[in-house]
Regions:
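Extracellular and organelle-lumenal recognition/adhesion modules and their flexible linkers in secreted
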Residues: 1-144
Length: 144
């Protein structure tokens, strides 16, 4: 079946990484040994189109970006997510490694500017970012 989780600022008693006061934490509150086959569970953040307009995504002048973040987990392994446009017709799946448990790890991903598809440059969702917390066997983590 599925698992449930809670999301909150400064979850548990984990100290934020050096230089930070807060973080967004997800804590599993009930788990089962499997996730339903077509299920994807994760965290989603939407960035307004005005904030990405200068990237010129969807044109031949598309600029590359760097996505960087801190991650902390009680599990090691390879994890993933995706950047996507508002129609979800195009996405950029990514993966990253957590090499050590219960330690903050800094992740940096370089993303080539997409030259195709439509990217909103108004007050709608310009780009979305998903971080996968778990996927079923027939579902890729947030890829199109």
């Amino acid at each position: 079946s599925n698992f449930t989780y809670s999301v909150q600022q400064n979850a548990g008693s984990v100290t934020p990484p050096a230089g930070y006061t807060n973080y967004l934490g997800a804590t599993v509150t009930a788990s089962n040994s499997s996730i339903s086959s077509g299920t994807a569970i994760g965290l989603r953040h939407k960035i307004e189109g005005y904030n990405i307009a200068d990237l010129a995504w969807g044109t031949s002048s598309a600029k590359s970006v760097t996505l960087s973040f801190w991650v902390y987990s009680s599990l090691t392994g390879t994890f993933g997510g995706a950047l996507w446009n508002s129609s979800q017709a195009l996405s950029y799946p990514f993966s990253y490694s957590i090499p050590q448990t219960n330690t903050w790890t800094y992740v940096t991903l370089n993303i080539a500017g997409p030259t195709s598809s439509t990217w909103v440059t108004n007050n709608g969702t310009g780009v979305g970012i998903d971080f996968s917390l778990g996927t079923g066997t027939t579902r890729l983590p947030y890829s199109k």
